[in-house]
Amino acid sequence: MLWPLDSIERRWDMLAPHVVAYGPPDEEPRPAVLLFHGCAGIRPHIDIYARAAAREGFRAFVVDSYEPRGWSQAYATTLVCAGAIFWGRERAGDVLAAVSGLAQDPGVDSSRIALAGWSHGAWSIMDLMTMPLERPGEAALADPTDEALVGVRSLFLAYPYGGPGALSRSRPWLRSPETYGVVAEKDHLTGQADALRNFDAARQAGASPHVWIAPGTHGFDAPGHEGFPSPMRYDPELAEGCQDRFLSFLHRTLDGPDGVFAPVVETSAAFGT
């Protein structure tokens, strides 16, 4: 561990000023999706997904794990993407703290929350699902508890890292929210077989994850990966298909008994402003 253990409250106090909220400009309790970026930090596609969710009537919160720690994109790309620091099991504390904090927001229906992660963010969510959350140190927190996770209905996991260090390789999940996995057929970080095998951890908990094998590379939905020497290639058609699946999944798992929310004008702001 590279830093002292935070309490859940202290971790949320650190993260909250850097969370960007998208959603209808009202105070009605609405279903919410929390979005967790990949190892290179927040890239434009994360905001695209958040805005799309907001237009459908959901609240969307983009959680930045790097700005609160003073980490630049270059620093994160060099160390986090290389696996030198901040593994999924540590960032899982950010996921838990964000759920705990945002579930208390009066504009959030705490019984209808989805978690969405891309690459490192998806890894962190998956690691969290394997943790009992009963003893200090789990998720790099002093006081982990699964109380806030009761309202987490669904997980959207886009090309999660599933190589060495990913807890789902060796541990079953202990929770079984509805899960939609996106596996990139040409992923250079986690081979297709390993990626699919990691979803077996969800099945061991009684979940029935739906997995879409997208015929693209890791990061296929992220603009900016178009050229050499990156092994990642942006595919706008696949990106649109992934966004459609994301929205359909949110509606299927978060819509209440009254059905689909009417489209609304979305706004964005730093959380709490």
Language-model segments: residues:
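Conserved alpha/beta-hydrolase "acid-adjacent" motif
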Residues: 188-197
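Short beta-strand/loop motif that positions the catalytic acidic residue
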Residues: 175, 181-183
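Acidic beta-to-alpha connecting loop that harbors the catalytic carboxylate
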Residues: 185-188, 216-217
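C-terminal catalytic histidine-bearing segment of alpha/beta-hydrolase fold enzymes
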Residues: 208-273
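Primarily recognizes the serine-hydrolase "nucleophile elbow" in alpha/beta-hydrolase
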Residues: 90-174
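Serine-hydrolase catalytic machinery in alpha/beta-hydrolase-like enzymes
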Residues: 6-23, 28-108, 123, 220-231
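An N-terminal hydrophobic leader/cap segment in hydrolases
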Residues: 1-25, 115, 120-121, 126, ...
